[in-house]
């Protein structure tokens, strides 16, 4: 598999985004960001970014954040094969510098690839298994 970030590695249409939003099989919350993931039938992952003006005001910052996310995704895509992933930015994401962003997303990718079944559970659900 190529480590590039071509068209086939992106979520492009509203229908593709809607499929992930409507029925995510994994959720990974992070600091100032939320990852929604859904399994796909492909041999590679696909990425979609939702970074609005409300959460990141300046276009320069939005573009910087998108570049950093795409770059970390490119390096971790072998671990993420078979996922459609949507990243939703929240306020405060622009306050992180590039190394902090890269570090945060490396952890988020690892959490998603390592334990997809648990990420789909609600935050308190894992603790209630012995009830």
UniProtKB/Swiss-Prot annotation:
Q: Give the GO cellular component terms, alphabetically.
A: ribonuclease P complex
Reaction catalyzed: Endonucleolytic cleavage of RNA, removing 5'-extranucleotides from tRNA precursor
User: In Gene Ontology terms, what is one molecular function of this protein?
Assistant: tRNA binding
- Gene Ontology terms: biological process: tRNA 5'-leader removal
Function, in words: RNaseP catalyzes the removal of the 5'-leader sequence from pre-tRNA to produce the mature 5'-terminus. It can also cleave other RNA substrates such as 4.5S RNA. The protein component plays an auxiliary but essential role in vivo by binding to the 5'-leader sequence and broadening the substrate specificity of the ribozyme.
**Which organism was this protein described from?**
Stutzerimonas stutzeri (strain A1501)
Q: Which SUPFAM superfamilies would you find in this protein's record?
A: Ribosomal protein S5 domain 2-like
Enumerate the NCBIfam families for this protein: rnpA
Q: What is this protein called?
A: Ribonuclease P protein component
Entry keyword set: Endonuclease, Hydrolase, Nuclease, RNA-binding, tRNA processing
Q: How does it assemble?
A: Consists of a catalytic RNA component (M1 or rnpB) and a protein subunit.
Enzyme Commission number(s) of this protein: 3.1.26.5
| UniProt cross-references to Pfam families, sorted A to Z | Ribonuclease_P
Domain of life, source organism: Bacteria
* Family label: Belongs to the RnpA family.
């Amino acid at each position: 598999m190529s480590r590039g970030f071509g068209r086939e590695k992106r979520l492009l249409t509203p229908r593709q985004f809607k499929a992930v939003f409507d029925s995510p099989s994994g959720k990974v919350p992070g600091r100032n960001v939320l990852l929604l993931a859904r399994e796909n039938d492909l041999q590679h992952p696909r990425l979609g970014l939702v970074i609005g003006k409300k959460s990141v005001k300046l276009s320069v910052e939005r573009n910087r954040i998108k570049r950093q996310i795409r770059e970390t995704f490119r390096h971790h895509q072998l671990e993420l094969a078979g996922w459609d992933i949507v990243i939703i930015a929240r306020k405060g994401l622009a306050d992180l510098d590039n190394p902090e962003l890269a570090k945060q997303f490396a952890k988020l990718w690892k959490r998603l690839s390592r334990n997809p079944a648990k990420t789909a559970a609600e935050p308190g659900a894992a603790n209630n298994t012995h009830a």
